A protein has these predicted regions:
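Structural alpha/beta surface segment adjacent to cysteine/selenocysteine redox centers
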Residues: 68, 73-79, 84-166, 171, ...
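C-terminal cap of thioredoxin/glutaredoxin-like
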Residues: 1-42, 162-240
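A generic local structural motif
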Residues: 57-61, 91-93, 192-193
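Residue-level detector of conserved, well-ordered beta-strand and adjacent loop positions
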Residues: 64, 73, 223
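Short extracytoplasmic/periplasmic juxtamembrane "stem" segments immediately C-terminal to an N-terminal membrane anchor
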Residues: 35-53, 57
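Conserved short-loop catalytic and cofactor-binding motifs
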Residues: 60, 113, 149, 176, ...
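A short beta-strand-turn-helix
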Residues: 53-70
Length: 240
């Protein structure tokens, strides 16, 4: 290859490298201030750094004794496979050992991921069930969704939502009207906004702390489908 051709090749390669670097810089500049998108969480380390985070229970449904010493806040998505894994593998023991015994109250807050197409409507449906039957019925509806869904996108057919309401002896016409009207759209969106504020960027994300009069706890963060032992260690420490 002649010297002239070598120069041309080097110039082309140099231009390509510079162009690639420029594109990368532009992309990083564009995305550096954007919040991370919510994701499904596999089992990860129990917390970010162990430092408590202030998190509110808001006005969301409570399972267990409202005067329990410990509050567990659960930010979840009804179509998240790791949320379902928590529901099947960890939640039953948590409920038996801590919630049913009055030591812990669990507050469920919605974090439907935008790539789970039915998750938002399922969250609103559970709120419509709560409107008729209170927190007890809310968690019955919650349990039915997690039991029936295949999770992760395919999920639960929306036609099943009023059927679950009927099975729970709710007024199906009132339920459907509530769901169709989007009555609880803002409620779900507020949960999403609050989740972002406390760094709950994936599902499930939990916060455990001592209960307070105003409902704002200093919560230790647990991320992902953790085993029962991860929850037990934090709860037992908080109960001392």
């Amino acid at each position: 290859m002649s010297g002239e051709k070598i120069k041309i090749v080097l110039l082309i390669l140099g231009a390509f490298v510079i162009g690639s670097l420029w594109t990368k810089v532009q992309y990083l500049e564009k995305t550096k201030n954007q919040p991370p998108l919510p994701t499904n969480n596999v089992a990860q380390a129990p917390s970010d750094n162990g430092a408590p985070i202030k998190v509110s229970v808001d006005d969301d449904p409570v399972l267990g004794d409202k005067n329990a010493k410990i509050t567990l806040i659960d930010f979840s998505d009804y179509e998240c496979p790791f949320c379902k894994r928590h529901f099947t593998d960890t939640y039953p023991q948590l409920k038996k050992d801590y919630i049913d015994t009055g030591k812990v109250k669990m507050v469920f807050r919605d974090l439907p991921l935008n790539f789970h197409v039915n998750a938002t409507q399922e969250a609103e449906a559970a709120e419509c069930a709560r409107k008729q039957g209170g927190d007890a019925v809310y968690f019955q509806y919650h349990d039915q969704i997690f039991t029936k869904t295949t999770s992760n996108g395919t999920g639960l057919a929306l036609e099943q939502l009023p059927i679950i309401a009927k099975d729970l002896k709710l007024n199906v016409d009132q339920f459907q009207q509530c769901l169709d009207s989007g009555e609880f759209k803002n409620e779900v969106e507020k949960d999403l906004a609050d989740a972002a504020k406390v760094g709950a960027t994936g599902t499930p994300t939990f916060f455990i702390g001592r209960s307070t009069a105003d409902g704002v706890i200093d919560g230790i963060k647990i991320v992902g489908a953790q085993p029962f032992s991860a929850f037990k260690a934090i709860i037992d420490e908080k109960l001392k």
